[in-house]
Amino acid sequence: MDRLCGSGELGSKFWDSNLTVYTNTPDLTPCFQNSLLAWVPCIYLWAALPCYLFYLRHHRLGYIVLSCLSRLKTALGVLLWCISWVDLFYSFHGLVHGSSPAPVFFITPLLVGITMLLATLLIQYERLRGVRSSGVLIIFWLLCVICAIIPFRSKILLALAEGKILDPFRFTTFYIYFALVLCAFILSCFQEKPPLFSPENLDTNPCPEASAGFFSRLSFWWFTKLAILGYRRPLEDSDLWSLSEEDCSHKVVQRLLEAWQKQQTQASGPQTAALEPKIAGEDEVLLKARPKTKKPSFLRALVRTFTSSLLMGACFKLIQDLSPSSTHSCSASSSGLFRPHGPYWWGFLLAGLMFVSSTMQTLILHQHYHCIFVMALRIRTAIIGVIYRKALTITNSVKREYTVGEMVNLMSVDAQRFMDVSPFINLLWSAPLQVILAIYFLWQILGPSALAGVAVIVLLIPLNGAVSMKMKTYQVQQMKFKDSRIKLMSEILNGIKVLKLYAWEPTFLEQVEGIRQGELQLLRKGAYLQAISTFIWVCTPFMVTLITLGVYVCVDKNNVLDAEKAFVSLSLFNILKIPLNLLPQLISGMTQTSVSLKRIQDFLNQDELDPQCVERKTISPGRAITIHNGTFSWSKDLPPTLHSINIQIPKGALVAVVGPVGCGKSSLVSALLGEMEKLEGAVSVKGSVAYVPQQAWIQNCTLQENVLFGQPMNPKRYQQALETCALLADLDVLPGGDQTEIGEKGINLSGGQRQRVSLARAVYSDANIFLLDDPLSAVDSHVAKHIFDQVIGPEGVLAGKTRVLVTHGISFLPQTDFIIVLADGQITEMGHYSELLQHDGSFANFLRNYAPDENQEANEGVLQHANEEVLLLEDTLSTHTDLTDTEPAIYEVRKQFMREMSSLSSEGEGQNRPVLKRYTSSLEKEVPATQTKETGALIKEEIAETGNVKLSVYWDYAKSVGLCTTLFICLLYAGQNAVAIGANVWLSAWTNDVEEHGQQNNTSVRLGVYATLGILQGLLVMLSAFTMVVGAIQAARLLHTALLHNQIRAPQSFFDTTPSGRILNRFSKDIYVIHEVLAPTILMLFNSFYTSISTIVVIVASTPLFCVVVLPLAVFYGFVQRFYVATSRQLKRLESVSRSPIFSHFSETVTGTSVIRAYGRVQDFKVLSDAKVDSNQKTTYPYIASNRWLGVHVEFVGNCVVLFSALFAVIGRNSLNPGLVGLSVSYALQVTLSLNWMIRTLSDLESNIIAVERVKEYSKTETEAPWVLESNRAPEGWPRSGVVEFRNYSVRYRPGLELVLKNLTLHVQGGEKVGIVGRTGAGKSSMTLCLFRILEAAEGEIFIDGLNVAHIGLHDLRSQLTIIPQDPILFSGTLRMNLDPFGRYSDEDIWRTLELSHLSAFVSSQPTGLDFQCSEGGDNLSVGQRQLVCLARALLRKSRVLVLDEATAAIDLETDDLIQGTIRTQFEDCTVLTIAHRLNTIMDYNRVLVLDKGVVAEFDSPVNLIAAGGIFYGMAKDAGLA
């Protein structure tokens, strides 16, 4: 390098130590200043150029119009280029004139000139690519300024020393150059305007990060405004920024889907296409399930999707690991402070370098973390989206294998695991790198003794590996328990009403607690192993230090351990400690994530529906539906459900499908939808499809949204759908009209209303083909007739459309075009009604037995038509008596109407319409003003708590852990930190031996005490970890038990108004946080708190001057802490609230996938799910940014601590003990991390303790009456007679609502059979709920056998009554469990009841018999079969009081007749209360109760009621029974 300097005015030396180092006035040689110092910015820019050009080429953000700022920056670049060339020409001029300039005067101007030209071109290229603030160029200009400062000073000092300027030309050009680069740097800090057509210009609340400058991005200053706002008031959702395009779900999910599809393609071989063509009429792309040669790797798909983010994060991490303060410069800086005879400026320079390098490390580290955490958020988002999309395409057999709860677990727990482990991914290579670097520099200081420490690390790795493998085993088992628990809880929440009616809560409670016990045992084992792993890795740095220093002083007596070696080594050991301490967390996280990865991958590899199962194009002319030789099964592993099906349905035909329960009617509809496995044959369906399932699927949204179902509003068509489906009048009594929010699963609608809404959805869709799976079973006979006439029949709005109607209503069959008769999965007969009668087969015999008498009066004429209209009107006005208060005088109005109609009947139909309208109007006028549509909300919105987490929450958790345990943990942590300080002070005293005695004495004693203190610290760490584990698991057990017991005892009204997803969120995510997040957070808080306190104490004790800056730094730290905690806490709460809708929507979607696919609305639901995930991301992204903002600002405080401790050590180096100074500096280098972690863990604690707050909230909700009152038990054998009596009984659904039963008084004799009828919402089901005390009395009493039911426990009551509910609910498990969960009955008893309930043939045909596995909700049984199972339950219990709530609505007439016979014989001496739609089933009952508007309208024998000509007579006449 000296040859570059020449021998002229620059001298002949490139570097001169006497000029630069060993002097009190340091300077650099002129040659160094004009060469390397000037080249540094150029080298940086050229090195960064390839990567930066690659980035600009692939990240076009728009086009920025040429502005004044851009012109100025360009002009400065051009001027700097000119200055460089002027310098170069001046050098050539000197050469020509014989002055022989040094080579550096040619090289430097040439290099700088070319670099300035490059910078100028980059300015314009950035503008064209839409870059508003260039970090690359800002660093370049900053380096130019910094590298020019030293020549700036040197030239002035030289001129002053010489009394003249030696080279006026270069002196002048240099200061012009300095002024220009300073201006360029200042201008580069300003931002350009947003690019044209930038999303930022359209967004009302864009994220400020997008428009932030380089330094703002680097320091996260752009977050400050939100931090201040969050400190001033609780943040709201409207305060949060919009998501950037790159973070939106649809974009992130699509990228992962493409990568996953490539994996599937590679796995299935080149012959398999990744994507199947789109199906006509559908918006989604379904993946075709094909046999695969190998399983696709989801991990590879993730890596390929997020490679760029991983690499960028890795680059930041690599720079941070190699930064000076993290390795040898840390040692060099520290050692310079211990030299009392060197120049003072050495210490000040090294202190400054420590501060600058620490600050750079902070900024780079948090850029790394921001990049990785944003990637982690995107990974979670992508996984949720992929799982959601997969759930829309899985087969029915997969749905039976994976319950809703298990799939929710995949989205909540498993996806979150990926987000939690992502920040540690780079430790896989970074930790070994840091260890290698630390050991390398230890070698430089201690020589081969450093290898002893390496040996310790190598020996401990297999031990920890064995521990981690065992932990993985426990983790897999624990996840299975967790899945089972969440699955069971999901079923309990979905079937909670049935559990209450049957008093089955204890057995399911026992099941949950049994699963929970196994889960906790595995958690405890895993946590113990985690504590052992923590002990190993906490002891590892100490063991390395001990053995390394011990070997060093023992192998050679000449090896002296002085302060410089000890504490430089200790600083390196502390650097070594960071990756080693993080390794247990990494191993634990990777173990858990590997389990989650396998679970997600297994789910994504499950079979999907074949989109080509149903052909949409190739079809016979004139045919809408064709099945040729079709054989179908619900699973490839199961025997066929439908055999040899051959059907051809013409366009516009109305086809009825009939047959007994379980014959395959619903399966045939599913086959047409492509929901079954097609084993043989071909299916063709031409045109769009609308599907009305047997059990209506209703969304948790408004009635209008349920009907429109994603289609644009067409007022005329919408009005027609409501009118024909008899919903118009409902709107007058619903509190919000068609904007009324229908609760989860349509909870606030009756079964009939849900079915009519489902039918209205189909009508509004205006599809070509309508598949109607028994839509008339859930409605009254007159409503069924209206719907058939107005919608389905030959004169209905669907006339001309192709309709396939599954029905048990034989009165509609004559109006169909032809009928398909199914039996045992095969078509036995097919033809027109008259043809089948003439055929004289089984269908004809069935009709002769069950069809109404054709000689009875036909349901035609003016009177009947008007009566039907009034019945519909009454039905509507009686609806929702829990929501509105309609006029109670309906009966009188109806009688008046009937009298007038009788007198007008001869005048013809045309004249009775005005009368009808007039009476309709009069009824509407009599509806009170309380019906005004103010709000239709039923589900209570979940509102985030605000302000500080209440101290009572912390107190509750501390009590759950155990107050003594909590105090003991605090003492253990205080003890272990005191021991750690003692060990380091002892080491400090050890190093002072050399200073005081000139040699080291008692080395073995020193080493022994140091070892003892270290081992004691490790034991205290392990003991504290074990104690925390015991306390945390105790707390988790108590909190879960309290939550479970409270929720299972909550009243039914709570479940009606609270989405199950919200409750399930408490049992899944919040319990997970309490299990696995809260305890480590508390341990980290204790550790960082005591470490920070220890650090301050040691620094103050070592350098008392440090007290001067403690207060200012503490004030700044306090401000940052208060701003951060207030903001992050509220962001965490908002995130928790926004999380529940994701899982609620997912649960809702999974139950309605067949409907969603049938209507082709898959894409709409994807968009809706993405919107809910994006809403959650809007809260998570600021939370991530808040952590980075905190880190930068708090670590700045820590870096100031490092700076001031070093400065004060330099100032007082002549009077301070070198050992204590070394101890002070080594502690100061740790304080940055400990202060940061203290605030972060404190905030994390506040954020995570919210899980306790949320669990406690649902652990203290109002509960039902006690299950058992020991002081007032029911008598043995009660009830004996079954006498039921209501005395002035009134009830409402919830406080503040109107009464649904009003002063009900009636007496039912023991053994009496009573039918209960009335319009929808008249109070029939409410009456039965009151009998079971699902609803508690507002006033009045119910007596059974003279005992007031309100005076005994709920289980004493409910266990002695039996109900067959309207909605048959089964639970996953064996058939035996569903019949006898308590195991009270023998197999013989169960088989006898199955025989009586006509299920024995089906159960006998199953290989497992009574151990036949029912899927969740009983989905692998038909609705009719499920109702038969409910009948079998009733037969087993054989109570004295039996309630039938429309129990045979979904059963064919023949089976219904058999069941009614069974009930008559088996419950002959029991009191039977039957709510019936089919009036023929109660015509032989002792009495019939007619309810109207919650009051008794009629109560007498059927014969007397028909003779009286009242309401019951009208209903019987409609049904053809009078």
UniProtKB/Swiss-Prot annotation:
Keywords recorded for this protein, A-Z: ATP-binding, Cell membrane, Glycoprotein, Lipid transport, Membrane, Nucleotide-binding, Phosphoprotein, Repeat, Translocase, Transmembrane, Transmembrane helix, Transport
Annotated ATP 2 binding sites: 1318-1325
Extracellular compartment spans: 1-32, 95-99, 154-171, 323-347, 446-448, 553-574, 980-1016, 1102, 1216-1217
Induction: Strongly up-regulated under conditions of cholestasis.
Membrane topology: Multi-pass membrane protein
Topological domain spans for side Cytoplasmic: 54-73, 121-132, 193-301, 369-424, 470-531, 596-958, 1038-1080, 1124-1194, 1239-1522
Catalyzed reactions: an S-substituted glutathione(in) + ATP + H2O = an S-substituted glutathione(out) + ADP + phosphate + H(+); ATP + H2O + xenobioticSide 1 = ADP + phosphate + xenobioticSide 2; taurocholate(in) + ATP + H2O = taurocholate(out) + ADP + phosphate + H(+); glycocholate(in) + ATP + H2O = glycocholate(out) + ADP + phosphate + H(+)
Gene3D superfamilies: ABC transporter type 1, transmembrane domain, P-loop containing nucleotide triphosphate hydrolases
Residue stretches making up the ABC transmembrane type-1 domain: 310-592, 966-1247
Gene Ontology terms describing biological process: bile acid and bile salt transport; canalicular bile acid transport; leukotriene transport; monoatomic anion transmembrane transport; response to estradiol; response to lipopolysaccharide; response to tetrachloromethane; transmembrane transport
GO-annotated molecular function: ABC-type bile acid transporter activity; ABC-type glutathione S-conjugate transporter activity; ABC-type xenobiotic transporter activity; ATP binding; ATP hydrolysis activity; ATPase-coupled transmembrane transporter activity; glucuronoside transmembrane transporter activity; icosanoid transmembrane transporter activity
InterPro entries: AAA+_ATPase, ABC1_TM_dom, ABC1_TM_sf, ABC_transporter-like_ATP-bd, ABC_transporter-like_CS, ABC_transporter_C-like, MRP, P-loop_NTPase
Subcellular location: Basolateral cell membrane; Basal cell membrane
Source organism superkingdom: Eukaryota
Positions of the ABC transporter domain: 625-849, 1286-1518
Glycosylation positions in this chain: 18, 1001-1002
EC nos: 7.6.2.-, 7.6.2.2, 7.6.2.3
Residues bound to ATP 1: 659-666
Chief place of localization: membrane
Post-translational modification Phosphoserine, affected residues: 902, 905
Tissue: Expressed in lung, ileum, colon and liver. Higher in liver of Eisai hyperbilirubinemic rats.
A Pfam short name: ABC_membrane
Function per UniProt: ATP-dependent transporter of the ATP-binding cassette (ABC) family that binds and hydrolyzes ATP to enable active transport of various substrates including many drugs, toxicants and endogenous compound across cell membranes. Transports glucuronide conjugates such as bilirubin diglucuronide, estradiol-17-beta-o-glucuronide and GSH conjugates such as leukotriene C4 (LTC4). Transports also various bile salts (taurocholate, glycocholate, taurochenodeoxycholate-3-sulfate, taurolithocholate- 3-sulfate).
Protein name per UniProt: ATP-binding cassette sub-family C member 3
Species assigned in the record: Rattus norvegicus (Rat)
